[in-house]
Amino acid sequence: MGESPASAVLNASAGLFSLKMETLESELTCPICLELFEDPLLLPCAHSLCFSCAHRILVSSCSSGESIEPITAFQCPTCRYVISLNHRGLDGLKRNVTLQNIIDRFQKASVSGPNSPSESRRERTYRPSSAMSSERIACQFCEQDPPRDAVKTCITCEVSYCDRCLRATHPNKKPFTSHRLVEPVSDTHLRGITCLDHENEKVNMYCVSDDQLICALCKLVGRHRDHQVASLNDRFEKLKQTLEMNLTNLVKRNSELENQMAKLIQICQQVEVNTAMHEAKLMEECDELVEIIQQRKQMIAVKIKETKVMKLRKLAQQVANCRQCLERSTVLINQAEHILKENDQARFLQSAKNIAERVAMATASSQVLIPDINFNDAFENFALDFSREKKLLEGLDYLTAPNPPSIREELCTASHDTITVHWISDDEFSISSYELQYTIFTGQANFISLYNSVDSWMIVPNIKQNHYTVHGLQSGTRYIFIVKAINQAGSRNSEPTRLKTNSQPFKLDPKMTHKKLKISNDGLQMEKDESSLKKSHTPERFSGTGCYGAAGNIFIDSGCHYWEVVMGSSTWYAIGIAYKSAPKNEWIGKNASSWVFSRCNSNFVVRHNNKEMLVDVPPQLKRLGVLLDYDNNMLSFYDPANSLHLHTFDVTFILPVCPTFTIWNKSLMILSGLPAPDFIDYPERQECNCRPQESPYVSGMKACH
């Protein structure tokens, strides 16, 4: 059921009353003992202090055993005002009777407040936690054994009482009406923390300088009086906030550690699984090897037996032939010996002729019938040599990922759109293939993120050689290359190596060259030639008066390009870039479509849109480097001989640009298709040697663009 209107009003009134009483109590609390003022003194500074607290201040200022009578002054604990004492000491100060009357009325109002009669104001000033209230607290005043359970604890007396002892010791009259009664709490919670320097004082301040809990006397007359102090509440809030923040971080870290530990446990489990798998695979592979050895053993044994049978059969046939021949020869020998015993010449001649022919024939045929003995037939040239196989078996081991290859930068070559990468490896026999990865290098700062970004890398897989040529690259651009060696066990990467393509090569375009310029056969040199007037005029051709211009035969709309110009003895020239739409009948740099570095005798300037800026340049400048970074909207000029940066134009390119060259005297030679020198191979912007100043050669110059 809902609360009745009368109850709601009553509860609201009770809450308002409690709030007002708590506010009033804070005004009636002594700054030393933090209790309601008791026998308050009215100090000259208009603050008040308990008589007993003032007495403790004087006692704390004395050495042990000394009297407080010689003390003639002390400081107000609230405002630090020095209070002077007469010969009467503290008794010479006025009593704050009005404040005492207010305290008396406050205590009566606390007892007869709007809440239930069984719970007075002094009983509500301190509520123990549920953990404290659940403990069994024994009465500390009972004489019986065991003592009865306490029903209240007096904060002022610091003693817990049962109901009988409470009525006996705390009648409803002064000074007991000012005692604060709470639910029973243990003695350890009741005592609180006392000051280290003043044993009878509770801590109520925090010394920031010494990082220590102190009491009011420590700040007033103790060794902390000149230190920075803070209230316990402020320090409590700050420390609690810090602890909560650190606790949050610790909980987060514990969560991360738990996740990490879970991953480690998962890895351990995976190790167990993989180990079992590898052990099973090892047994399987070894069993297969043993099976192969057994099969080869049986096969070789069969071959030995077959060879033995074949050789013995052959030898047996030869033995039989020899035996047959021997038998015939023996018969013939016996017949011949018998004839030789015949003394009758006629009979001998009659029989010997036939025998002699047979012996001669047998002697001749025996040379044919006797077989040649081949000692190879004795199986002596047969040998079993498994030393190579034994060595392979001794080197039997599980396969590991190959050693990382190393890119040989000194062997790598480049053109304006290709780079050939060479690498070596000391582990080629265990490598099944290579993989080449590359991407555009945009600065050291983003290399780590670039390295971890899979989408930004181009990949060339399944390379079998130790070199590879990458085609279709941007001109004058730096790339990062990584080579990965791969086998069945895994892969390992080489260290990243930076390589760069050369700039786009170009030559001077005869169709755009001024009529009074002579172009060399290779298209790389231009020279002033007043006699060369045979060329016809076209809209593309430079046609300025007094200056003679030429342009390269390319239009650039991307990439980074570097070329150099050798000026030789020329003292009046302009070198830069221009849009195709730039006017051909005026000096380059005098319009918004061209940007140049120019020399006029001893003056060096950069010019754009009819504005110039002087540049500090060594007078011996004979070669000018030009770096066009179209993608980053920059055109820079350098002194390559001295590794000196001269000037950089910041340009927002909207159209393709063309290299342009103008001379007033002598000649120029172009060196194109060059790699950018290492001294300008850094991402940091270098300081230029420009200073704003009006030039006498072009009107309307105020600043460098």
From Swiss-Prot:
Sequence ranges assigned to domain B30.2/SPRY in this UniProt record: 486-679
Annotated EC: 2.3.2.27
Zinc finger (B box-type) in chain: 137-184, 190-232
Gene Ontology CC: one annotated term: cytoplasm
TM regions (residue ranges): none
Catalytic activity from the UniProt record: S-ubiquitinyl-[E2 ubiquitin-conjugating enzyme]-L-cysteine + [acceptor protein]-L-lysine = [E2 ubiquitin-conjugating enzyme]-L-cysteine + N(6)-ubiquitinyl-[acceptor protein]-L-lysine
Residues reported to bind Zn(2+): C195, H198, C218, H224
Free-text comment on this protein's domains from its UniProt entry: The tripartite motif (RBCC; RING- and B box-type zinc fingers and coiled coil domains) mediates dimerization. Associates with microtubules in a manner that is dependent on the C-terminal B30.2 domain.
Protein name: Probable E3 ubiquitin-protein ligase MID2
Lineage per the UniProt record: Eukaryota, Metazoa, Chordata, Craniata, Vertebrata
